[in-house]
Every structure is written in structure tokens, then in C-alpha cells.
């Protein structure tokens, strides 16, 4: 709800332009992107509990400022503060689960977190529209205050203070060194990079043509700044907000591609489908929310179900692939909706699409937990969430362009006596008052065609997400149990790298038992990150972390020696 763009501090109903600008370029989005990556570092440098509570406090303060804003300037400033705070909330929740639950159980809990996130993404704007139409837009922000207080109390009372004190050796650094770890150079360059890209995608094809000098200049400057950002990240090394060693890992970049595309598809459907109900079926904001329940329920149920299935099967890559396929098919079916489509169609299509998003959206965060050592998990989580959020922003901007251009061309082609600019400036429920009754049928057809065209964007992005899903390595969230006899010691399990877990784990086990005196004498490609009686080892050839239980690996070592 707090993401809904409010151009004026008044009590007018949300217009189509307001809804289409739900996630465009603005200061909150820019600072949100910055904050997401920054929190990846901050969670390594400071205790997760207190960073999460501070982020929540900033979000609450920003919401309070927005709700009480006497002018648009106050609203903008409040959204900046809220954006800085909200950037650390979802990543913090994921990391808190990672601290208290073993890897094989995190899929289920992350599934529930993802289900709630999906519900909020769809229901939030609809509730915001209802508040704006029936009460006041300020309630969109004030409602966050009691919810945030309850969350803060729960985290404060139930999460121990020093549970992760040994998580990262950098936590003992002085403040000056910690500031150097934050990669301020990269952050400074990233701000104008994001602004240029978002402005170009938002203005191109609407305010200016794609060939306009302003749009070309924005893309060129954005590209140059992006190159500069990459150079800075390489120069900064492990201090970078996006460390090159992290980007090289197949799991990270494959999950980033997948999340960028699938979440972009999800947001396009989430924000244009309610418009279809309001414009074509004559729903109010509240009614469109009710008719959108099949999508919400589909995403929620299958998100939890996927988490349980990953917990049982051990693998998550299959869920990403299945999610891409179902989402692409579901979005394609939604693009066939007509003015006279019956309930069976729009309910069934929503359930299918929701199932795809439910299966796929949360798995990249599980993949990060399975593939990365502890000291990189917060940064890896932040990168994936950043790409997810950025992908949604770009997809919405592209879909907005498609809708605006198609609607204008349809209105002109149908000869409907209405100003397209005036049509875009009113709410979707106010269409009948714009034209004479004999033209309303043609207006509905023009609107239907324009909205369903945006679902092609959802089809394309869901289809592209498959490129990322099939590249995500098949790693298991279950602990590897070593065979008891030497004959089967080298047996390769399905989807397992041919290198045995003994080969990978032995240096770490020997170091732990004192048989190797110095860690420096071993290859730097092997990292020891103990947790929950596990030893995590990293093989540079596979670029993944493989885990084995200390006890079972000792048995395998003994078996080989014999």
C-alpha cells in the first residue's frame, strides 16, 4: 500500500495513472534499491536482530511521516525514509529464519514467508485503493504502525541478543573499517545509474518517443554509469556491495535472472488484472480485490506446498522450472480474456498462474542458503532480492508503455469521441461517465484489448525466467549421509557433482581435528563455515557449497583409509 504513488495530498480516488505508477521511478524506489544492497553488507557487520529492528523503526517513522504529511514534499521525504527501512526487512526475515532453522527446514518456512509477501504484493494496492475511496489515503500509511509495533515486540522478545555473535569476524572491526566495507563509492555511482534507467523506461514511448534525444541520452548515461559501477566493484573486491566473487557463482547469477523475470511477470499481472475487473466487469476497488482472490490463494497455497515438497525431496531446481512453465501458460491464458469471459475462465487462469508463481518465487532464496557459505549468505540474499525488485519495476514500466500506447491507438481506431489523456486521468470505475451510452461498448473493447496486451509482457518475462531456472544447480537442502562401506563411497547421487563429498570435506575435517596445523597451508578454495554440526566446503570448480555431517564424513574417511 505504501508503494502506491500519490501525486497530490488530497482525498480523490486512485486513477488509472496512479495504479499504473505503482512502482515507477521516484525517490523511494531509488533509495529502496540502494538500501537492499547496503543491508547485504550491514547484516554481516552487525547483529541481524538489531539491524532488523532499526530497519523496521525507519520504515515505521517513514510511514508516520507519510500519513501526517501536510504537503507533497513531506510525503516524498516520508517515502524516502520508509524506503530505506523497508530495504532491509524481507532480507532480514530470511536471514533470521536461516539462523534458527537447519537448511532442510528453511524451504518450508521461507515458503510461508514468500506466501505472505505475495499476498501483500497483491492485496496491498487493492486495500490502498479501498482506503482511498472510502476513508482516506492516509490510512494506507497509518495501518503500518500497529503491525510494525507487534512485529518489533515479537522479534525483541523472542530473538536472543548474542545468538550470532561469531557469525562474521568483521563485526569486531572499528567503525572506520566498517565504513570502508560498505563500498560508498559503488553506492554513490549506483544512484544515478538507477535513476537514468528508470526514467528512460518510464518516459520512453509515453512522454517522449523512444527515439527522442532525452531517452537516448538517459540510456547512454545509464550504460556508462553501469560500466563505471562494474569497474568500481571489481576494484573494491570483497568490499564491494556486489562482490565479484559472489557474482561468479552460478547459483547467484542464475537465481538473479530467474527472480528478475518471474517477479516482473508477477507484478504485471498483480497490478493490471484488478484494472481489468474494474474497467471490464465494472467492479469497485473492493470487488476487484475479491475477484483477485484466486490468484492470491493460488500463490499462497502453492508457495507453502512447494516449500513442503522441497523439504521432503531435498531439491528445489525442479520447482523453479515448473514455476516458469506454469506462470508462462497462465499469463498466456489471461491474455485471452474477453469482455464476456465467464467466471470459470478468469478463476481458472488465475489459479494456474498463481500456482506457477507460488512454486517458483521463493526458491532462489533457498538456493542461496544451500549454495553459499555463511559469510556470503546475507550479500547473496540481498543481490537476489535487489534483482527481484528491480525486475518488477522494469516490467511494470514496460507494461505501462504497452497499455498507454495500445489504448490511445485503439481509441483513435474505434472513433470513440473521448480524449485519451482524460481517459487515463480518471479511475477505471468512472468510464461510463466519459462517453455517451452508444460508445461505451466500443470503449470496453478498446480497454480490454489494451489491458490484455500487458499480459504479453507477463508471458515474455515468465518465459525468460526459464533461462535462469534451468541453470540453477541441482543441490540438495538435506545433509549428505556418507555410505558405511568403501564400495559405495564414490557413488554419485542424482544431480551431485562427481567429486565425492570426502574429497571436498577432508581438508576441513583434518583441520578441525588438528592434523593440519595451518589453514594457510591449504587451498584458499576451501572454506570452513561450521553450523549446526556441519562443515561447509567450497569447491572453486563447481562454485557451490556442499555440506556433510562431521560424524558421517569421519566414517567415510575411516572407510577409505581402511
From Swiss-Prot:
Topology of the protein relative to the lipid bilayer: Multi-pass membrane protein
Cellular component annotations (GO), alphabetically ordered: plasma membrane
Family assignment from sequence similarity: Belongs to the major facilitator superfamily. TCR/Tet family.
Biological role: MFS-type efflux pump; part of the gene cluster that mediates the biosynthesis of elsinochrome C, a perelyenequinone phytotoxin structurally similar to cercosporin.
Places the protein is found: Cell membrane
GO molecular function: transmembrane transporter activity
Protein name (Swiss-Prot/TrEMBL): MFS-type efflux pump elcC
Principal subcellular localisation of the protein: membrane
Expression induction or repression: Expression is up-regulated during the late stage of P.nodorum wheat leaf infection and is controlled by the cluster specific transporter elcR.
Signal peptide: none
Region (Disordered): 515-562
Pfam families the record matches: MFS_1 (PF07690)
Glycosylation sites: 448
GO BP terms, alphabetized: transmembrane transport
Positions with biased composition (Polar residues): 533-554
Entry's transmembrane regions: 50-70, 80-100, 111-131, 139-159, 184-204, 215-235, 257-277, 288-308, 309-329, 351-371, 383-403, 455-475
Amino acid at each position: 500500500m505504501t508503494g502506491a504513488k500519490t501525486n497530490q495530498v488530497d482525498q480523490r480516488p486512485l486513477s488509472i495513472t496512479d495504479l499504473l505508477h505503482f512502482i515507477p521511478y521516484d525517490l523511494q524506489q531509488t533509495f529502496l534499491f540502494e538500501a537492499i544492497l547496503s543491508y547485504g553488507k550491514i547484516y554481516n557487520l552487525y547483529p541481524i536482530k538489531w539491524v532488523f529492528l532499526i530497519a523496521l523503526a525507519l520504515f515505521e517513522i517513514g510511514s508516520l511521516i507519510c500519513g501526517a504529511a501536510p504537503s507533497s514534499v513531506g510525503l516524498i521525504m516520508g517515502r524516502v525514509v520508509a524506503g530505506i527501512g523497508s530495504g532491509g526487512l524481507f532480507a532480514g526475515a530470511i536471514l533470521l529464519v536461516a539462523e534458527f532453522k537447519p537448511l532442510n527446514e528453511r524451504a518450508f518456512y521461507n515458503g510461508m514467508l514468500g506466501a505472505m509477501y505475495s499476498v501483500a504484493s497483491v492485496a496491498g494496492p487493492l486495500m490502498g485503493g479501498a482506503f482511498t475511496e472510502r476513508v482516506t489515503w492516509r490510512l494506507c500509511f497509518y495501518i503500518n504502525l500497529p503491525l510494525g509495533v507487534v512485529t518489533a515486540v515479537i522479534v525483541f522478545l523472542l530473538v536472543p541478543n548474542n545468538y550470532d555473535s561469531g557469525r562474521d569476524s568483521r563485526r569486531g572491526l572499528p567503525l572506520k573499517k566498517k565504513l570502508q566495507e560498505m563500498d560508498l563509492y559503488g553506492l554513490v555511482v549506483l544512484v544515478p545509474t538507477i535513476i537514468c534507467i528508470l526514467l528512460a523506461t518510464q518516459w520512453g514511448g509515453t512522454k517522449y518517443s523512444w527515439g527522442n534525444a532525452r531517452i537516448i541520452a538517459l540510456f547512454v548515461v545509464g550504460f556508462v554509469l553501469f560500466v563505471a559501477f562494474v569497474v568500481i566493484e571489481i576494484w573494491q573486491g570483497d568490499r564491494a556491495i556486489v562482490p565479484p566473487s559472489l557474482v561468479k557463482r552460478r547459483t547467484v547469477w542464475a537465481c538473479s535472472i530467474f527472480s528478475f523475470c518471474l517477479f516482473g511477470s508477477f507484478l504485471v499481472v498483480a497490478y493490471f488484472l484488478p484494472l481489468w475487473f474494474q474497467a471490464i466487469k465494472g467492479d469497485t476497488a473492493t470487488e476487484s480485490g475479491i475477484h483477485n482472490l484466486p490468484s492470491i490463494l493460488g500463490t499462497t497455497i502453492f508457495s507453502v506446498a512447494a516449500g513442503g515438497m522441497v523439504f521432503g525431496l531435498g531439491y528445489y531446481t525442479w520447482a523453479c522450472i515448473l514455476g516458469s512453465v506454469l506462470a508462462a501458460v497462465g499469463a498466456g491464458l489471461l491474455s485471452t480474456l474477453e469482455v464476456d469471459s465467464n467466471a470459470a475462465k478468469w478463476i481458472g487462469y488465475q489459479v494456474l498462474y498463481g500456482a506457477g508463481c507460488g512454486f517458483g518465487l521463493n526458491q532462489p532464496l533457498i538456493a542461496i542458503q544451500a549454495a553459499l557459505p555463511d559469510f556470503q549468505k546475507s550479500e547473496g540474499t540481498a543481490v537476489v532480492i535487489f534483482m527481484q525488485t528491480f525486475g518488477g519495476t522494469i516490467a511494470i514500466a514496460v507494461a505501462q508503455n504497452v497499455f498507454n500506447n495500445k489504448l490511445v491507438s485503439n481509441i483513435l481506431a474505434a472513433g470513440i469521441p473521448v480524449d485519451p489523456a482524460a481517459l487515463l486521468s480518471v479511475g477505471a470505475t468512472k468510464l461510463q461517465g466519459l462517453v455517451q451510452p452508444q460508445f461505451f461498448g466500443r470503449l470496453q473493447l478498446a480497454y480490454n484489448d489494451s489491458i490484455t496486451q500487458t499480459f504479453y509482457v507477463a508471458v515474455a518475462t515468465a518465459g525468460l525466467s526459464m533461462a535462469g531456472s534451468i541453470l540453477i544447480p541441482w543441490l540438495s537442502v538435506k545433509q549428505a549421509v556418507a555410505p558405511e562401506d568403501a564400495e559405495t563411497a564414490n557413488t554419485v547421487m542424482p544431480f551431485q557433482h562427481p567429486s565425492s563429498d570426502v574429497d571436498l570435506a577432508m581438508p576441513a575435517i583434518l583441520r578441525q581435528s588438528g592434523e593440519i596445523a595451518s589453514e594457510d597451508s591449504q587451498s584458499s578454495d576451501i572454506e570452513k563455515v561450521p553450523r549446526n554440526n556441519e562443515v561447509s566446503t567450497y569447491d572453486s570448480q563447481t562454485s557451490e557449497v556442499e555440506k556433510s555431517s562431521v560424524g558421517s564424513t569421519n566414517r567415510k574417511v575411516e572407510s577409505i583409509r581402511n
